[in-house]
Amino acid sequence: MAAWGRRRLGPGGGSSRERVSLSATDCYIVHEIYSGENAQDQFEYELEQALEAQYKYIVIEPTRIGDETARWITVGNCLHKTAVLAGTACLFTPLALPLDYSHYISLPAGVLSLACCTLYGISWQFDPCCKYQVEYDAYKLSRLPLHTLTSSTPVVLVRKDDLHRKRLHNTIALAALVYCVKKVYELYAV
């Protein structure tokens, strides 16, 4: 499998322009080398193996799989942010609006927060890709050995701890659920 374009970068694997030396477990490059009919499947397999190996940086040269991965991460980020913002709106709307009208905004916002949190939990929570973010910072990208690539527009993923992020949106969504159940009970049972 090493002959299929996989390269690990370790000390001395980059150039003298690097400001930080990377160990062999820091960076993995999915090279765009077409060696048969199933090259796209091989790229996906290499990416999956790199994600499961938990490399700090993953550089994806193949444009199609890089764009798909970046979109997948963007959708997950959107679900997370929507869950947090809608849950926050659900919880703080009763403080800002009169009580007679606040439930018209807070209940739909709470349901939206719960829906996004549930969808994130089902589709993204156990995906190894959710531990990564797409890196756009030019300074951080300059520290990586991108000069060895054949692609001019690689997608660079950086591994980040998402434990606090998941706790935040789960806590806010749970609080929104409690508020919504309480409010529905007050509106219809009393």
Swiss-Prot record:
- Return any one Pfam family short name: Mito_morph_reg
List the transmembrane segments: 84-100, 107-124
Query: Which Gene Ontology CC terms are recorded?
Result: mitochondrial inner membrane
**Subcellular locations according to the entry:** Mitochondrion inner membrane
Question: What is the organism of origin for this protein?
Answer: Rattus norvegicus
Query: Its biological function?
Result: Plays a role in mitochondrial morphogenesis.
Assembly description: Associates with the mitochondrial contact site and cristae organizing system (MICOS) complex, composed of at least MICOS10/MIC10, CHCHD3/MIC19, CHCHD6/MIC25, APOOL/MIC27, IMMT/MIC60, APOO/MIC23/MIC26 and QIL1/MIC13. This complex was also known under the names MINOS or MitOS complex. The MICOS complex associates with mitochondrial outer membrane proteins SAMM50, MTX1, MTX2 and DNAJC11, mitochondrial inner membrane protein TMEM11 and with HSPA9. Interacts with IMMT/MIC60.
Task: List each coiled-coil range.
Answer: none
- Keyword Kinase: yes or no? no
Q: What is this protein called?
A: Transmembrane protein 11, mitochondrial
Q: Which InterPro entries match?
A: TMEM11 (IPR026120)
The record gives the membrane topology as:
Multi-pass membrane protein
What does the UniProt keyword field contain?
A: Membrane, Mitochondrion, Mitochondrion inner membrane, Transmembrane, Transmembrane helix
- Enumerate the Gene Ontology biological process terms: inner mitochondrial membrane organization; mitochondrion organization
Q: Is this entry keyworded Mitochondrion? A: yes
Q: Which family does it belong to?
A: Belongs to the TMEM11 family.
